[in-house]
Amino acid sequence: MREQRKATLILDDGSRFEGYSFGCERAVAGEVVFNTAMTGYVESLTDPSYRGQIMVMTYPLVGNYGVPMKAAEPNGVSCFMESDRIHMEGIVVSDYSHSYSHWNAVESLGDWLKREQVFGLTGIDTRALAKHLREHGSMKGKIILEGGEDIGFADPYTVNQVAEASCREVIVYGTGSKKVVLVDCGVKDNIIRSLLREDITLYRVPWDYDFHRIAYDGLFISNGPGDPNMCSVTVEHIRRAVAGDKPICG
C-alpha cells in the first residue's frame, strides 16, 4: 500500500482538520455537511441531492464493505446505487478501511473515488467536526493536499445544481394504467423504484419541463440539491398544477 499524502479540510470560518487522502488527489471545494448513518456510503455518494457537497460521515469505520458492481434493471434504474455516478466533491471519514469484504463488492471505496475523481479524506475526528457544523450550520469548505494547489471556496448558491442533476429529456418507465409525472430536481433511483411498484406509467421529466403537456393523473416532485430560488420555472409550473385538481406529492 502506497504512503498516504497529508491533506487538510479548511472551513470558511478558519477551522482546520488535518488527515490523509485516500481517493482522487486533487483540491476540491464545496458545502460541508454531515451524515450520521452507520451504513450507506455508496447510496449517499451517488445521491444527486448531495451534488457539489463535501460529506462528513460520523460513523467511525467507512469502506469495510467496499463498492458493489454497477448494475441496472431492464428499465435502466440502478440496482445498488442511487444514480449512475458520484455527485459529491469529497467524503470525510474517521477511519477508512483499505480492505473490504462483501458478496457484491467489486472494488474498494478508495479505488472507486479515484475513478470518479472524488476526494477521500481520512484520519479526521468526524464527530468533533459534525458537532462544529451542528453548532454553526453547514459551511463552505475545501480540501487541500500538502504541497499541492490551493483553491478558493465554492459558493453553492451561484450554480444551479438542480439543472446539473436533473435528466435532460423525458424518460418513460412502465406501462401501468395511471400516468404519473415525476419532476426530476435531482431524484434518486430508490424513489423511482418505489413508484414503479405501483400500476403506473411514470414520466420522468427535466426540472424545467412544462409537464402540463402530459395528461397526467398524479404529480410527484422530487427533492434535489442547491438553492430552490434558482428553480423559478419549476415553481411556476407547480403553481399552475396546485390550482388544478390532480393529486400532488413532493
Language-model features, listed with the residues they occupy:
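RNA-binding accessory domains that recognize and position tRNA/RNA substrates
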Residues: M1-Y209, P228, E236
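N-terminal beta-loop-helix "entrance" segment that forms/cooperates
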Residues: V28-A29, Y216-G218
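Short, hinge-like loop/turn segments at secondary-structure boundaries
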Residues: S138-K140, L219-S222
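Short amphipathic alpha-helix with an adjacent loop that forms part of the alpha/beta core around
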Residues: Y209-A215
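Cysteine-nucleophile active-site neighborhood
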Residues: Y216, N223-G250
